[in-house]
Regions:
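HTH-adjacent hinge/linker in prokaryotic transcriptional regulators
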Residues: 2-29, 34-99, 107-115, 119, ...
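Conserved phosphate- and dinucleotide-binding cores of soluble alpha/beta proteins
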Residues: 2-5, 9-12, 18-24, 30, ...
Length: 252
């Protein structure tokens, strides 16, 4: 493959996934790490990507990748994460399930459970779980975001604040190198904070593409959660925050 073709392919991968690691690109193109680093440096100079230690991300931090594209990426990783999370949730539990394709994977993995009571602001989650007659599903009120089935707004935040549940299953758009949790929509950030504040145990579910991925709104530190479920070892800066705050890390 010519360099220009590889550059175009790298840009498409970054657009599709939001973030790609150097290791992924080396394996994908069967070239040396030095070649990929040169490619990424060239593309960063052209402002086609944002260069990160260990990979590359989208240059824009104001618009999220379309839901259908996110749904189709890292499916195996999301399923592994979902199975591990589901195994930690006893039958009869109460839980929040957040917006996002990884929380949606968790919802699917919970179909083998019984007598769960679930509060969600994710229409896709509700549609998945409604097949279970023994589940009690409470759908939060608010503004429906048609692009991904998320329900957001002040009404959603106030609704969630009425509950105190055993678990909060939380997704996130990006995690900065210092452990900051990043989102694209400040309305969604408020809803996520409400889930954190009203859950006894918060499980953050993220695949490797979220590490180093940019988004515009800072929700706060990853230290706000109780456990992180992911498919790869987080970057050193994030690991330091997890270790210092005794946050449980589960590699799936």
């Amino acid at each position: 493959m010519k360099q220009t073709q590889r550059h175009d392919a790298i840009i498409e991968l970054v657009k599709k996934q939001g973030y790609v690691s150097t290791e992924e690109l080396v394996e994908h193109f069967s070239v040396s790490p030095q070649t990929i680093r040169r490619d990424l440096n060239d593309l960063a100079e052209q402002n086609m990507i944002l260069r990160h230690h260990g990979g590359a991300a989208l240059p824009s931090s104001s618009v999220n990748t379309p839901w259908h594209d996110r749904k189709a990426t890292q499916t195996e990783e999301k399923e592994r994460i979902a199975r591990k999370v589901a195994a930690q949730i006893p039958n009869g539990s109460t839980l929040f399930i957040d917006i996002g394709t990884t929380p949606e994977a968790v919802a699917h993995a919970l179909l083998g459970h019984s007598n769960l009571r679930i509060v969600t602001n994710n229409l896709n989650v509700a549609n998945t779980l409604m097949a279970k007659e023994d589940f009690r599903i409470i759908l939060a009120g608010g503004e429906l975001r048609s692009r991904d089935g998320g329900i957001i707004g002040e009404a959603t935040q106030d609704f969630i604040a009425q509950f105190r549940l055993d678990f909060g299953i939380l997704g996130i758009s990006g995690i900065d190198s210092d452990g900051s949790l990043l989102e694209f929509d400040y309305h969604e950030v408020r809803t996520k904070r409400a889930i954190i504040e009203n859950s006894r145990h918060v499980m953050l579910v993220v695949d490797h593409s979220k590490f180093g991925r940019n988004a515009m709104v800072n929700m706060g530190s990853i230290s706000m959660v109780d456990a992180v479920y992911t498919d790869t070892l987080p970057p050193p800066g994030v690991m330091q925050v997890l270790t210092e705050n005794y946050i449980q890390l589960e590699l799936c």
